[in-house]
């Protein structure tokens, strides 16, 4: 069952990384990296439904990826993996709202994470749809304007709007300006 979920796995041990990717592959598209720096770059490049991160990485703590992940991907499910039950680490994980799991973990654990990520994504999509419908009515938005808002809500980079809608970039710019004028909201910029 492929649900189209996107997972970011940040784990420095290649064998564990492969195991996690294998366990997540039946639920979506896992991307795996081995360092904090690579994790930050991956988070900047796209949005994810779930982050599975090791605590001890060669260039820092995986815990330092939680805040940037939540900022870039609101509603992201975070699972922190650790080889030892250090009280201070577990405390930090729980304070961040993430889950933790002691290594080793198996495919059954990955299914639980995938199910939670899918549930959160579906809830987020329902809220977005309700908001878009309300805005369409309140601001008398055209179908094109609703589509622009929808692309923004999906996390599509503004530069890619013209490609997705198959129009010129200056057309997108004008449509966004009209949308901003109608709504009086500059958060779309």
Role assignments for model-derived ranges:
Residues 155-189:
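Recognition helix of helix-turn-helix DNA-binding domains
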């Amino acid at each position: 069952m492929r649900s189209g979920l996107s997972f970011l796995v940040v784990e420095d041990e290649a064998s564990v990384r492969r195991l996690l990717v294998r366990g997540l592959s039946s639920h979506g598209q896992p991307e795996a990296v081995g360092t904090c720096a690579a994790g930050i770059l991956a988070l900047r490049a796209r949005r994810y439904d779930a982050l599975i991160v090791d605590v001890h990485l060669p260039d820092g703590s995986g815990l330092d990826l939680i805040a940037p992940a939540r900022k870039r991907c609101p509603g992201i499910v975070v699972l922190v993996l650790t080889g030892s039950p250090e009280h201070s680490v577990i405390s930090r994980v729980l304070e961040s709202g993430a889950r933790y799991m002691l290594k080793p973990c198996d495919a059954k654990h990955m299914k639980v994470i995938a199910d939670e990520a899918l549930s959160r994504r579906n809830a987020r999509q329902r809220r977005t749809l309700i908001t878009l419908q309300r805005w369409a009515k309140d601001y008398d938005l055209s179908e094109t304007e609703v589509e622009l808002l929808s692309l923004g809500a999906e996390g599509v980079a503004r530069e890619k709007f013209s490609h997705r809608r198959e129009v010129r970039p200056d057309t997108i710019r004008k449509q966004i300006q009209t949308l901003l004028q109608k709504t009086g909201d500059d958060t779309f910029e």
